[in-house]
Swiss-Prot record:
Residues 26-47 are annotated as: Disordered. One of its GO terms (cellular component) is outer dense fiber. The modification N6-acetyllysine is found at K376. Keywords: Acetylation, Cell projection, Cilium, Coiled coil, Cytoplasm, Flagellum. The lineage of its organism: Eukaryota, Metazoa, Chordata, Craniata, Vertebrata. Residues 30-39 have a biased composition (Polar residues). This is Flagellum-associated coiled-coil domain-containing protein 1. It comes from Homo sapiens. Residues 122-226, 283-315, 387-414 form a coiled coil. It is found in: Cytoplasm; Cytoplasmic granule; Cell projection, Cilium, Flagellum.
Length: 445
């Protein structure tokens, strides 16, 4: 855009890189180089010498697409500018490098040979040169910023115009679409209402027909249910009578078996108890006889002593002692008789208790057997009734399914008949319309 190649405008940025920092090259040593030109390494500029203010360039979408397309082709692109003999500038999309050759230093040697009195360049001359370069660069940067601001203003105005146009187009299209949508919605609502009315009429007719058929089927099912109930009651009464007979027969058999078992047990237990009672009575009787014999022996000894005392005519206190002894012996005899009577009474009581226990055990066993038989009979009855009811339930469910299938088939037939009638009605209406149109045309002609 500009004749000077050093000027870089941010508005013209094909690589989409934005502003770059100026790279300051270090000073070469002042020794006279006799060989070929050496490249100096590039060092990024410090923060003190960052004279450029980074600004983001305003890039339109078209320029972005153009830059993205050119990135692949311009990867290896670089530009070489010879500013002066011995001072070469290389500009790439990422950096700017400067090369100082021998020619620049040879020129200094010539100046020294031509003007030997002046000597070498002083530092003041170098500083003045650098200040001139800095002033030129600041002017370039100011020009770039002005160009950038003007380009940004132009692009913003163009974008505002385009946005306004796009908004207006969008509003117009949106209005047209809304109008078309409202018209379509109104048409669809009208069509839907008409279809709903027709379907409601057809559904009411179907409901009336279905109600009549349902009443008929309900009455038929009730009669069938009553007949099945009567049959089930008859079968149940017969089975009940059979169960009662079987129960009586089984009870009699069980009671006879238990009676035999209990009689055998009672005979065995009574024999053992008789043996025990006889043994106890014999032991008591033997003890009584032994005690009786001992008492008789004592009595005889006492009588002998009395006779001896009578003969000797002892003192009367001895007689009192003997009388007391006889009195004690008689009391013991009376106690023995009482004990025998009590033992006999207790034996009778034990026999009565044993008999009562035996009879109670028999009754308990009978009741247990009756309860067990009743439980078994109830379980068998429950199982049989469950099986019978399951069978009846299965039969009834199958019949219900069959009836539902019949109802569905009849409904389908009715629907087909209604659809055929509607088709015939529509065809007849179309024929009548065509006939009326033909008659009107003939009258007009």
């Amino acid at each position: 855009m500009y004749p000077n190649p050093l000027i870089y405008c941010t508005c013209w940025d094909p690589w989409n890189l934005g502003p770059r920092k100026l790279i300051k090259t270090p000073q070469l040593p002042r020794k006279n180089s006799t060989g070929s030109s050496k490249l100096t390494p590039l060092v990024p500029a410090p923060k003190n010498h960052n004279y450029l203010q980074p600004t983001k360039p305003v890039v339109s979408p078209k320029m972005k697409i153009h830059s993205a397309r050119q990135e692949e082709t311009n990867k290896s692109f670089y530009e070489v500018i010879n500013v002066s003999p011995g001072y070469q500038l290389v500009r790439n999309r990422e950096q700017i490098s400067v090369t100082l050759g021998d020619e620049m230093f040879d020129r200094k040697k010539r100046w020294e040979s031509e003007i030997p009195d002046k000597g070498r360049f002083s530092r003041t001359n170098i500083i003045s040169d650098l200040e001139e370069q800095i002033s030129e660069l600041t002017a370039i940067i100011e020009q770039m910023n002005r160009d950038h601001q003007s380009a940004q203003k132009l692009l913003s105005s163009e974008m505002d115009l385009r946005c306004a146009e796009m908004k207006q187009n969008f509003e117009n299209k949106n209005r047209e679409l809304k109008e078309a949508h409202e018209a379509e919605l109104s048409e669809l609502e009208n069509n839907y209402k008409a279809a709903l009315k027709a379907e409601k009429l057809a559904a009411q007719e179907k409901l009336e027909e279905m109600g009549k058929e349902y009443k008929y089927l309900k009455n038929m099912f009730r009669t069938y249910q009553d007949s099945i109930y009567d049959e089930m009651e008859e079968k149940w009464s017969k089975q009940k009578a059979k169960w009662k007979k079987d129960e009586k027969f089984e009870r009699e058999n069980i009671l006879l078996q238990q009676k035999k078992k209990m009689t055998k047990k009672f005979e065995m237990e009574s024999g053992e108890e008789d043996k025990k009672i006889n043994e106890s009575c014999s032991a008591v009787f033997e003890n009584f006889i032994q005690e009786k014999e001992e008492l008789l022996k004592q009595h005889q000894s006492d009588t002998l002593q009395l006779e001896e005392l009578r003969k000797t005519k002892e003192v009367p206190w001895r007689r009192d002692q003997i009388n007391r002894h006889w009195h004690d012996v008689l009391q013991q005899l009376l106690l023995m008789q009482v004990m025998q009577e009590e033992l006999h009474a207790q034996a009778l009581i034990l026999e009565s208790l044993n008999t009562n226990l035996y009879y109670t055990q028999l009754e308990l066993q009978k009741e247990k057997a009756i309860v067990g038989n009743l439980e078994k009979m109830l379980q068998t009855k429950f199982a049989e009734t469950e099986e019978k009811y399951k069978h009846t339930i299965q039969i009834l469910t199958e019949e219900n399914i069959h009836l539902k299938q019949k109802i569905i088939s009849k409904n389908e037939e009715i629907c087909e008949g209604c659809s055929g009638r509607l088709a015939s009605i529509t065809v007849s209406k179309d024929d009548s319309d065509t006939v009326q149109d033909g008659s009107k045309k003939g009258q007009e002609s």
